[in-house]
């Protein structure tokens, strides 16, 4: 994916994946293997865009502005890119579901570190190992099959994003 080759996006992704944590320039530099001077430049750009803010701690840290609609939008894009790049949807499609729908906080871009990814699959139950996908996306994955869906979840599923097939 083109965006993942952009160092600004790589810095922003740290805040998308761990949106409640305070991050530090040197920590980000180590995680994404980018010079701390470049990280600092990108941090200042993200502050200017209103996606993150400086914390008032002894050491200068930065945290996501999770209420900002632009942060939510960019986070949602990042979530979809991670799902696509993980190949999870391609693996699920091998079981011939009628549709695959992402719903819940991950779909809305409102997920935090402890959130899971809710995916509805219009199919009979099948087994799939999720560990590698969960490791790549940094979230637990919860698959909900058609036969297991109760009435209260139908509304959430109907508001979700179609990743494959149709409603």
Model-flagged regions — what are they?
Residues 1-98, 107-113, 122-167:
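Catalytic core of pol beta-like nucleotidyltransferases
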């Amino acid at each position: 994916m083109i965006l993942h080759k952009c160092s600004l996006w790589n810095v922003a992704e740290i805040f998308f994946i761990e949106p409640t944590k305070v991050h530090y320039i040197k920590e980000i530099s180590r995680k994404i293997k980018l010079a701390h001077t470049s990280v600092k430049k990108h941090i200042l750009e993200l502050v200017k865009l209103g996606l993150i803010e400086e914390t008032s701690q002894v050491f200068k840290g930065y945290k996501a502005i999770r209420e900002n609609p632009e942060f939510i939008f960019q986070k949602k894009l990042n979530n979809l890119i991670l799902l696509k790049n993980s190949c999870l949807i391609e693996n699920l499609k091998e079981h011939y579901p009628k549709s695959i729908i992402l719903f819940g906080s991950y779909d809305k871009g409102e997920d935090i570190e402890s959130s899971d990814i809710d995916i509805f699959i219009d199919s009979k139950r099948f087994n799939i190992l999720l560990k590698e996908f969960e490791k790549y996306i940094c979230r637990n994955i919860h698959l909900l099959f058609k036969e297991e869906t109760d009435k209260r979840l139908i509304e959430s599923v109907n508001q979700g994003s179609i990743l494959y097939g149709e409603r």
